[in-house]
Regions:
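Sec-dependent signal peptide recognition
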Residues: 2-10
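N-terminal mature-domain "stem" immediately C-terminal to a signal peptide or N-terminal signal-anchor/transmembrane
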Residues: 19-93
Length: 345
């Protein structure tokens, strides 16, 4: 099977001249410039380190006014741990002052400020993405964006109903040496760059908004289709983004998937995993990994996302514009989407 894959991959690349990667859907792009979206963003990471030069009570009052409950969340989860009942101001101050002067923490913050002296680029990307999100999902409410230092533990996540928190330290670039010391796998690092900040921020909002995740009641194929729906939505929110960024693959991995789509589909069918509800299979084909077991090294992990995306694209093409993006996400079961997609790579 591996030899067959390698032969087909090389042969198809020779014929295609590697143009598969640049082949994308062409569709009208709506004008969202007039949508009334106001993006408020704050640098919790920088404000936190202002404690080094300020009186504690005044600083804390300012932090609570600006960040609300996220201040206590950060304190409990990154600085001090669960606080005892009663007045803990003295404990807070001692722990926070130790935290902001800690050599390791300061090194991470220095790296953040070196890569992100400001977040204007990310805010431009997020503002445009939120406009598209609002256009396609009118009930979408724009969150306040908080950037913070997660000590290499958290990327992007909604916080409550009105805030989105982004750990900038998870997007410092694959050359960041600290990623070695904290054990970040090499195969993940191409996604830990500034270009991915807005993409993963919007994905986290999508997951929260649609309560998206792998449904334990679904078979593997249905889980792939649902993942494909999410990636397809991201392609509308980021219309200029290449498939590699949307899928989280490298360019070479994306080229492999494009040129070997038929063989990938055959491989999954031959494995007889698509119509079974097996959590290990879902993890194997939809989870993060350096590659997919049984396939060539060029194949990415999480290869089910690519197949799911292609099924959804086929479905939307078959509907001829009769199904809106909103309806795609909310009305139709994954099984129906696959059956009506007439997917035949």
């Amino acid at each position: 099977m591996r030899k067959y894959f390698v032969y087909c991959f090389a042969w198809l690349l020779l014929l295609s001249g590697c143009h598969w990667f640049s082949k994308k859907e062409s569709r009208p792009r709506p004008d969202v410039s007039t949508l009334d979206i106001k993006l408020v963003s704050k640098r919790f990471d920088k404000d936190l380190f202002m404690l080094r030069t300020l009186e504690f009570d005044m600083w804390k009052q300012q932090m609570l006014e600006r960040y609300g409950e996220f201040y206590y969340f950060y304190l409990d989860n990154f600085v001090i741990g669960p606080r005892p009942a009663g007045d803990t101001s003295d404990v807070e101050e001692a722990a926070l002052r130790q935290f902001v002067t800690d050599r390791y923490v300061r090194t991470i913050q220095d790296s953040i400020e070196s890569v992100f002296p400001d977040t204007r680029q990310q805010e431009q990307e997020l503002l445009q993405a939120f406009r598209y999100f609002k256009y396609y999902i009118p009930e979408f409410q724009t969150p306040e964006v908080l950037y913070f230092n997660s000590i290499y533990s958290a990327g992007s996540s909604p916080f409550g109903k009105k805030q989105l928190v982004i750990g900038l330290d998870m997007f410092l670039g694959d050359g960041n040496h600290d990623y070695d010391s904290v054990g970040v796998f090499q195969y993940l690092r191409h996604k830990m760059k500034p270009a991915y900040v807005s993409r993963y921020a919007v994905e986290s909002l999508f997951d929260a908004y649609f309560e998206n995740g792998i449904n334990p009641e679904q078979n593997t194929l249905e889980a792939m289709v649902d993942r494909g729906r999410k990636i397809y939505f991201l392609s509308y929110v980021f219309p200029d983004a290449p498939d590699s960024l949307l899928l989280g693959y490298t360019q070479k991995q994306t080229e492999f998937c494009r040129s070997s789509e038929k063989e990938i589909w055959k491989f999954l069918n031959d494995k007889d995993v698509l119509l079974k509800n097996n959590s290990m299979d879902k993890t194997r084909y939809l989870g993060e990994a350096p590659t997919t077991s049984g396939m060539p090294a060029e194949a990415p992990g999480n290869i089910g996302s690519f197949i799911g995306l292609q099924i959804v694209r086929s479905y939307m093409k078959e509907t001829g514009g009769a199904v809106s993006l909103h309806d795609l996400l909310t009305k139709y079961p994954a099984k129906t989407i696959f059956e009506k997609s007439k997917y035949r790579p």
